[in-house]
A protein has these predicted regions:
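Conserved CoA-thioester-binding segment of acyl-CoA-metabolizing enzymes
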Residues: 1-59
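Glycine- (often His-adjacent) and acidic-residue-rich active-site loop
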Residues: 58-107
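Glycine-rich, phosphate-binding/catalytic loops in enzymes
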Residues: 35-37, 70-74, 160
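Charged catalytic carboxylate motif
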Residues: 33-37, 104, 111, 208, ...
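Terminal peptide-recognition signature
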Residues: 19, 23, 37-38, 56, ...
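C-terminal alpha-helix plus adjacent terminal tail
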Residues: 1-14, 63, 75, 81, ...
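Crotonase-fold acyl-CoA enzyme core
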Residues: 110-224
C-alpha cells in the first residue's frame, strides 16, 4: 500500500489519491521524516496524470498532534532531500534555524498549497499547531463532528505556527482571540467562521470526503487547475504572502528571544514537564 516511512498512499477511487499520515503511536505528530514523506507523496499524486483530486487524512485516533518535539531519533536535515532554495542550515544562531524552519515548515507548506490539483483535508479529533498548517495547505477541509482546532504556540512564547494563515482562515478579530487565549475551536464554530467547509459525523467522514472528491474529479482538470490558481492568486493579491513572510520572521524573533532567556527556542513554561527534557535534547543535537 505504501513505500513511505510515515504515510500511506492509495487510490480509493478512480482519479483520487489519498495520503494518510500514519504515526498513530505519536498521534501523527509531524517530524522531518513525515514532512518529506508527505512532500514525496504529494509530488507523486501531482505528477500522476490520472489523479485529479488529492485527499489528506490522518490515521486514527486523530488528524495531527502538531510538530513532534521529540525530533527524528538523531537524524538531521542532512538525511532528507532539500526541496526549496534555503541554505546554510548548519549556521550558528538564528541563521541556521531560520533556514531550517523556512524549508521544512513555511515554504514546503506553501508548496503544497499551490499544487495544481484540488486537495481535501479530512480532519477528525484534534488538529493542533503544526496540524493546522497541514489542513490549511488544502483547498477544502471536511471535519468530523468531534474535530478540534487549536494553536497553543503562544503559550510557548512564540507568535503562532510558522505558516501563519490564522487571519485568512478565521478573520482578524477571531484570530486574535483564538491566539491570545489558546482556546479550542470546535468543528461547528470552525465551519461558521469559514475555515471548515463541511462537518459530518465521524463515522461517515471518509465516505463523505471521497464522495466530494469523486464529484470534483468529474470536472475538467484544466478548469479545476486554473480556478484554483485564480482563487489563490486573488488571496495573494490581498497581501497574504507578504503578511505570512512577516509573521514567519517574527516567529523566528520569538525563538531567538527564548534562546537568550531560556536556552531553548520556546518558553519552557508552556511545555509539559515530560516534553521539556526531550525538547532540550533535540535542540542540543
Amino acid at each position: 500500500m505504501s513505500e513511505y516511512e510515515t504515510v500511506l498512499y492509495d487510490e480509493p477511487l478512480a482519479h483520487v489519491a489519498r495520503i494518510t499520515m500514519h504515526r498513530p503511536d505519536k498521534r501523527n505528530a509531524q517530524n522531518m521524516a513525515m514532512t518529506y514523506d508527505l512532500n514525496a507523496a504529494f509530488d507523486r499524486a501531482a505528477q500522476d496524470a490520472a489523479i485529479k483530486v488529492i485527499v489528506l487524512a490522518g490515521s486514527d485516533p486523530l488528524f495531527s498532534a502538531g510538530h513532534d518535539l521529540a525530533g527524528d531519533g538523531g537524524r538531521t536535515w542532512r538525511d532528507f532531500p532539500v526541496v526549496g532554495t534555503c541554505c546554510h542550515f548548519d549556521a550558528d544562531g538564528a541563521e541556521g534555524r531560520y533556514a531550517r524552519e523556512k524549508e521544512i515548515y513555511k515554504d514546503i507548506t506553501e508548496r503544497w498549497r499551490n499544487i495544481a490539483k484540488p486537495t481535501i483535508a479530512a480532519v477528525q479529533g484534534r488538529c493542533l499547531a503544526g496540524g493546522l498548517m497541514l489542513a490549511w495547505a488544502c483547498d477544502l477541509i471536511v471535519a468530523a463532528d468531534d474535530a478540534e482546532f487549536r494553536d497553543p504556540v503562544l503559550e510557548m512564547g512564540v507568535c503562532g505556527v510558522e505558516f501563519f494563515a490564522h487571519p485568512w482562515e478565521v478573520g482578524v478579530r477571531k484570530a486574535k482571540e483564538w491566539l491570545f487565549t489558546a482556546d479550542t475551536l470546535g468543528a461547528e464554530e470552525a465551519r461558521a467562521l469559514g475555515m471548515v467547509n463541511r462537518v459530518v459525523p465521524r463515522e461517515r467522514l471518509m465516505d463523505e470526503v471521497l464522495a466530494l472528491a469523486e464529484r470534483i474529479a468529474a470536472k475538467p482538470m484544466f478548469a479545476l487547475t486554473t480556478t484554483k490558481e485564480a482563487i489563490n492568486k486573488s488571496q495573494d493579491a490581498m497581501g497574504r504572502g507578504v503578511a505570512m513572510d512577516n509573521a514567519f520572521s517574527l516567529h523566528q524573533l520569538c525563538h531567538s528571544h527564548n534562546m537568550q532567556r531560556f536556552g531553548i527556542p520556546v518558553d519552557p513554561a508552556g511545555l509539559p514537564e515530560s516534553v521539556r527534557s526531550r525538547f532540550q535534547a533535540r535542540d542540543d543535537g
